[in-house]
Structures are given as structure tokens and as C-alpha cells.
Amino acid sequence: MFIDKGASPLPIREAKMQKTAYYENSGLFGGYTYAKPESYSYGPSQQQYPQSSLDNDYPSTACSVQPAAIRAPNHKTNDISNSCMRTTSSQNSNQTPSISNQQHQAPSLPPSSPSHSNTSAQKKSKSSNSSGSSQSTMNKQIFPWMKESRQNSKQKNSSSTPPAGENCEEKSPTGPSSKRVRTAYTSAQLVELEKEFHFNRYLCRPRRVEMANLLNLTERQIKIWFQNRRMKYKKDQKAKGIMHSPTGQSPDRSPPLSGPNLVGYSSQLPTVNSLSYDAPSPTSFAKSQQNMYGLAAYTAPLSSCLPQQKRYPGAEYEHHTMQGNSGFANPNLQGSPVYVGGNFVDSMPASGPMFNVGHLSHPSSASVDYSCAAQIPGNHHHGPCDPHPTYTDLSSHHTTQGRMQEAPKLTHL
């Protein structure tokens, strides 16, 4: 009982102290709020409440909220310094929706709103500055070196630009992997180069320098063009030679010669007694026989014993009598024709005399038929492996009495 009696006056005193504190501070809030309305702008929708209605209608709520309202400015200034104004203002507005709470928050919001706007502006400016700085750093990291490389390439191209009228592009300096751009020549330059190539396939350096100055080209470009043009000329010549050759071979190739059957081609001379070109023969060839042959005669390897030879002057032909194992005719191939004295004759049997040209022994014969189409047997074939080379591509030639026809011209020599 004593505890109850002693404890009863304490809440009354606390209530009186809170009321007096409220009425003492109400003037402060009233002057802070209503006496100086021009110091803080609230907008056109700001409502002012009379003090009497607050005192009569909401005494207890105002007393209960008063200490928090008194502490609010200091607390919120600390929050402003810590950049936490937005969260505290939103919490206070959500937790105390009453009119008195709005009134007590009114003096606290005015200093906070400009500071909050300032902080938001500062945050925006900082974010914009940070974004601008990040963009600038990104620009510095990516774009400037590319722009510098382009400027450098432009400067290099401008410094290395050739004179007017030249359509050649220099080597691009963008990277080591870039290839040299193909040089484009104008029609006038090509005409001059082709004209010069027609007269001189190889240019000396003074002429090359002169043409470089004349055509606005470099000396190196002219040199490379002439190298390429010479290679093209060689290819064209080879293609023409293959097309014009009858056998499809290149003209610089001659029929193959093998073994002891080496053929001596006679030179195309008008006289009969002139010396003919004899191919190198084996060691068994007799030296005394070299000058005994007329025009277009084949030299044949002989054996150790030489038969007697009969030499005819002028347009007459000599008769050869040889043994069966020496000569072009092989006993196994008796049907192969042999070219002797400008004519094709069929080989005789191995036991009898060979190369006996019967229809040429008389000078009074009207004409001699050189055509070989009727004298070639069916079993004869041409090829590089044929040990008895014969020539069937000769056209028909005719000779009269006392005059000898020249040997057929060989175009591939």
C-alpha cells in the first residue's frame, strides 16, 4: 500500500512538466513556423494550422511527440552530414501521418529540403562528373589512339603522296600484317611502258630514271613492271611455239637420238660437193668415209672391213654395199625403211648387199619421187624408243635431170 501511495504522484508531476515544456516550446515552434514564413518556401499548397486547435484537440499526442520533434533537427543535421536524409524523412512521414506530426516536421523539413536538394544536386553533379570522367577515361582508353593512328596515316599519306596524274597507292602504315596495295597504271603509262618494252626488254638505270620522271612513277615500279612483262612475253612465246609445232612439242626440242644410231643432219646448201654436218659416230666409224657422201646422206657406223665405195660427181648418187650387221637395217626388222641419199628405201635381206638404190643410178631418169607415203610399211611406228628413226613428215619433192632438189627444211632447228 505504501508503494502505491508513493508511486502515484510521479506520473502527475511528469505530465505537468511535459505540459509546461510543451507550452514553453509551442511559442518557439509557432515563431519558427508562422512568424517567419518567408524564410522557408513550402509551395502554394502549404497549410497553416491555428495554435488553439492544436492545444485543444491534440494535447496528449503533441506532448508525446514533442521530445522527438525537439530532437529532430539535431538528428537530421547529423543525417545530412552522413547523406542519409532521404531515408529518415521517408520513415518519419510514414510513421507519423497525423497533423501535429506534420506540424512538428514542418520546421525540420525547411533546413533539410534545400540541403537535400543541394545534396541531390551534388550527387547528380558527382554522378554526371563521374559518368563524364568515366566516358572520358573510356575515350582515352579506346578512341584517341585510333584517331591518332588515322591522323598519322593521313599525315604519312599526305607526306608520301605522289605527284598529280599518278594512280599508285603507297603501302598502308596501319599494321605490319597489311599487304602492299596493287599498283594501278593509267592507259597513258601503259602505252609508254609497252612502247619502251617493244624496243628494249631490259632497261638501263639512266633510262629507267628518265621514264620514272616522265611517267610520275618510281624506279622500283618500272623495274617490277618490266620483270612481269618479260615473264608474260616468255609465256606467250612458249604458247605460240606449242601451237605452231606439228607434234605439239616445243620448237626447241629435237627428236631423240639413242645408241649408235646417231643421225647426221645435212646442212641446206645448194651444191652437192659441199661438206655436210655429220653427227658424232661410234669409234668404229672410218675417217676416210666422211667426205664421200653427197647432200642429205646419213652416215652409218661400219664394221672393221670397209667395202669399196663408188663416188659420183654432180647430181649422181653413190651406191653403198655393206654387211648385214652394220647399218641402220636390223635383220630382225627388215621391213623398216631407211633414209639413204635423200630417199626412203626398204631394207634388203641381211645376206645380200644393202642400200642399192636402183632407180637413182641413171642420171637420165625424168623425175625422182620423194614421197614416202607408199613406201612405209604398216608395222612401222614412231617413238622415242624406236632404234631406227625415220622421217615421214616430208612432202613430195621432184628433181629433174642434172639438178638436185634441196633437202627439206627443218623448222625446229
UniProtKB/Swiss-Prot annotation:
SUPFAM superfamilies: Homeodomain-like
Short sequence motif named Antp-type hexapeptide, residue ranges: 142-147
Start-end of Low complexity biased regions: 37-53, 87-107, 114-141
Main location: nucleus
SMART domains (UniProt xref): HOX
Residue range(s) of DNA binding per entry: 178-237
Molecular-function annotations in GO: DNA-binding transcription factor activity, RNA polymerase II-specific; RNA polymerase II cis-regulatory region sequence-specific DNA binding
Pfam families: DUF4074, Homeodomain
Region span, Disordered: 36-181, 236-265, 381-413
InterPro entries the UniProt entry points to: DUF4074, HD, HD_metazoa, Homeobox_Antennapedia_CS, Homeobox_CS, Homeodomain-like_sf
UniProt GO BP: anterior/posterior pattern specification; embryonic skeletal system morphogenesis; regulation of transcription by RNA polymerase II
Keywords from the UniProt entry: Developmental protein, DNA-binding, Homeobox, Nucleus, Transcription, Transcription regulation
Subcellular location: Nucleus
Superkingdom in the source lineage: Eukaryota
Compositionally biased tracts (Polar residues): 54-64, 392-403
Xref: CDD domains: homeodomain
Gene3D superfamilies: Homeodomain-like (1.10.10.60)
Gene Ontology CC terms: nucleus
Protein's job: Sequence-specific transcription factor which is part of a developmental regulatory system that provides cells with specific positional identities on the anterior-posterior axis.
PANTHER family: HOMEOBOX PROTEIN HOX-D3, PROTEIN ZERKNUELLT 1-RELATED
Family to which the UniProt record says this protein belongs: Belongs to the Antp homeobox family.
Protein name: Homeobox protein Hox-D3
Organism name: Xenopus laevis
